[in-house]
Amino acid sequence: MRKISVAAAVTLLASVGNAYAAGYQLNEFSVTNLGRSFAGIGVAGDDYSALGYNPAGMTLMKRSGMQAGLTMTEVASKIRGIGDQSGKKTDMDFMIPLPSMFGQYNVNDKLFLGAGIYVPFGLATRYGHDSFVAKDKNGVRRSELEVVDGNISAAYKVDNHLSLGVSGILRHIKGKLTSNVNSPLPNLGYSDFKVSGWSTTMNLGAMYEFDEDTRIGLSYRFKSTQRTTGHHTISVNPMYAALASRFGMGVDNRYDSVSDPELPASWILSGYHKFGEKWGTTATVKYTQWHRFHVFPAYSDNPLRPDLGVQYRWKDAWNFALGQDYYLNENWTLRAGLAWDQSPVPNSAYRTNRIPDTDRLWTSFGVSYATGNHQFDFGYAHLFMMHGKVWNSAEKDTNAKYKSYSNMYALQYQYKF
């Protein structure tokens, strides 16, 4: 099996404008938390998603229950050529669904069990086949990543102040990259690189309640490295069929592929304080260890050996969020939030068309309506993306400037047993 360095091939982790948390990490598996820009995740105590952030926070939910949510994310980007690509432009606007589901069973007032399915990582890049980005150099066409976590969790309330939690995670990753074949010959053909695989990881958490109105929580999600396998397909333009035959290839060619992507570890520190009967303030600091993201090695039996190697050299990144809840009455809760999300991309030389990531500012609001055993949650967020350039990048990508934004629309239903 011959080596091709396809950081991009399982970078797949790319999004035009990168509409989620910085890099390719996602937080969007709680609608109540989205309404406050994910401030207080794991310790807010108003839905069953804590096991996805800090499993110790499960002890805040006094009744067993379940919830299901869906976040629809609009990704919009204006891409303008710069340098040797000046005067060229393309636009992009598409929607991505992010579903989630959680359930919790309170064994007694000490032991809490839970399970969840959600998407902690994943992005998409979709350049039109006739865009100047798709026609140039590496010919980035389409990149997709979907990481689904199946989570089994347990939390234990040690006393009236301290709670501890642990989550075991079964993780499935699936990725796809479509691009032009990297060759000096024009329109040589297209390359599809598809991989999928399984891995395991875990999440540890602790929460300390100073009193019923004040608490903090700290959690750590371990990194995961998974062996992914699949196929690398090269479709050769029929006009080059004779040339392809000299390399023992036909018009359509399929090869085995392997890659070992690493998904980063992260720390979450969250706090909550209730002021009087009406106001609740939340805050979160999140630290993600992106420094290991240099190159994703990948392997293929492809005899043409297209070199898609990329040097990213990402840095660790911070996220800061502040949220406010207003408890209007026993049925209605209003909330809003603000967050700053730091990009792990160090500079324009390591920003690529596959991951044109930049810093972003979150603004959001949400509302919940509770009646009896039912609760309905709605959240909206708008992300202001800082402008970013791809310029003399490590991948020798197409020089371009990105102006992007994102809108998120989310609904969730909770049922308490």
Describe each region flagged by the PLM.
Residues 17, 32, 49, 62-68:
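A generic secondary-structure signal marking the coil-to-beta-strand transition
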Residues 41-64, 103-107, 155:
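Outer-membrane beta-barrel pore proteins
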Residues 20-37, 41, 81-87, 95-417:
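Outer-membrane beta-barrel porins/channels
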Residues 1-20:
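Gram-negative bacterial Sec-dependent N-terminal signal peptides
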Residues 38-41, 65-74:
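Short strand-turn segments of transmembrane beta-barrel domains in outer membranes
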Residues 75-79:
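Short, solvent-exposed loop/turn elements at domain surfaces
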